[in-house]
Amino acid sequence: GSNENHDSMVWIEGGTFMMGADNEQASKDEYPKHKVTVNGFWMDATEITNNQYRQFVWWTKDSLAAVQLGFFKQGQESDTAIDWVKARTIKWNDKATLEKLSALMLTPDNRIYGKIEIDPDKIVYNIQGFDLKEAAKYENEGRPRKDFIYRYNQKVYPDTLVWMRDFSYSYNEPMTKRYFAHPSFGTYPVVGVNWKQ
C-alpha cells in the first residue's frame, strides 16, 4: 500500500496486535489471547454523510423505477442495462408515472393524507458476487462456479426509527422525522444503516 489519497480515502497500514484476554475479568468469548495480523486497507477519510448516502438511495430508487418502466438498453451478449438517458426523464410528480410505478409506492392504507410516496421498504439494492474464499478451499476444488455465487436484496433506506429505539430516554422525534431527508443535516453522518448497506 501507499499513503496516497484515493477519492477521499486514506491508506490504513497493516499491523499485528494481541487480541483477546488473559485475566479472570474477561468473558469466555475473549479467550484465548492470541496474535492477529491485519493487512493494510483503504478506508474513507470521514464518515459517510447523509448527502452521500442519499445519492445512493435515490440512485437505487431511480434504478428500480427505470426497471419498472422498461427503460433498458441491450448490453453485451444477453445483458441489459438501464438506459439512464430515459431514466433521467422520470417525472416523480406526474400522476400517470406514479400509477405505472404503483408497485413501488406505499399502499393506500399506509399513506398520510393520501399522499402517493415511494415505499422505503421497496428501495432495495440487488447484490451479487462470487465467494472467492469459499471457492478457494481445497475441499471445494472441482465444484461448479454457480455453487459460489451469492445473490440477495438489501434494503437501503436508513432505519430512521433508530433515534427513538436506541435513545428512548431522549426526545428524538424531530430527528426521526427529518434527520435523513432534511438538507440541514446533509453533511452530518448517516445514521440507521448497517455494514451491508
Language-model segments: which ranges?
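Extended beta-strand/loop cores of jelly-roll/beta-sandwich
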Residues: G1-Q197
